[in-house]
Every structure is written in C-alpha cells, then in structure tokens.
Amino acid sequence: LPTQDSSRLVIEQGAQIDVSGLRDVTLSMSRNQMANRVFKSELADQPLQRDGVLYRQTLQFDARNPINVANVKGFYEGIQRDAREWSTVGGNVSIIGSGSVSVQGASINVSGGRITYEDGALKTSLLRKGDRIVTLDQAKSGDRYDELYNSTSGNGKSVAGFEQGFDAGSLTLSAGQALA
C-alpha cells in the first residue's frame, strides 16, 4: 500500500467509468462450423487413426464440441476474430493514490460482455465402425473406424441460437484512506 499523504483523488458523484465488455456482438451460427483436413501431425497422438480413414480427409464439426480422434487444437487457434469479439471481455480499472481516494456515488462497470449466436445449421462428419455410426464428437480415440462420411449437400443439423458470456474485468482501489 502507498504511504499516506495529504493528496486527494475524488471521482464525483454520478461519474461513470465503463470498461465493460461489449454486449451487442452478434455472429452467425456458421462461425462454429469447422471443416479442416487432418494430416499426420493432427493424428500423431492417435496410433489407431494415423493410417486410418481420417488421414488426409476433411473433418466437419461444431467448434464447441471436443474431438477425441485427432488433435484439432490448431484449427481452433486459426479462427479469425475481430476487435468486437475481443472486446467482449471486461476491462480492468486501477485507482491508486497515496492520500485519500473517494468514489462515493460514482459507477465503475467492469462486467463481462456477450456474443449472441443466431440460429443456424452445422455439419458434422460421421464415422462408421462395423454396423455402428457415430458423429465425430462421439468418436472414441481407441476405436479404429471403417469409413468417414461428410455431408456434401444440405444445410446440416439445425442448431438453436445461444448467448456466450465472457469474463468480467477487475477493480483495484488502493489508497491510504478509501471512501467507496
């Protein structure tokens, strides 16, 4: 903590400091559609899949669902995000003084924002093992699959829109004497 002196920092009543995340960002559901080819590097940790039906094939999946039969981390990292998306996380405010700090009646907003995803459709690859067919996100890394199916027509599975919330920021108030 700072040593106390006679200085004063006053944020007037009615003042508003707002570093909250954006709440009016809307994206298409297709933003969650992944369609990427997998190679040896994505299958390096999957010995049963390395030379199987997934190798050099395009996998279609919902980015919100984990995939166990390939390492698709790099695909997630490749999603392009604009400034509005990055601005959904709340900001940080630090008010530091060595004397007194007064923020009585002021409003400081560090809340997190949200992204609203519209209704849409997503395609998911299917895998066949014997007479059983599973979606890619249900596939187990310990199973060797006989065939991969990708949708080449149609819209895919309908998915209801949703809201995704983001982290709030922080408020740091440090003073010899604080009135909040």
Regions found by a protein language model. Name each.
Residues L1-A180:
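Extracellular and secretory-pathway beta-repeat/beta-biased strand scaffolds
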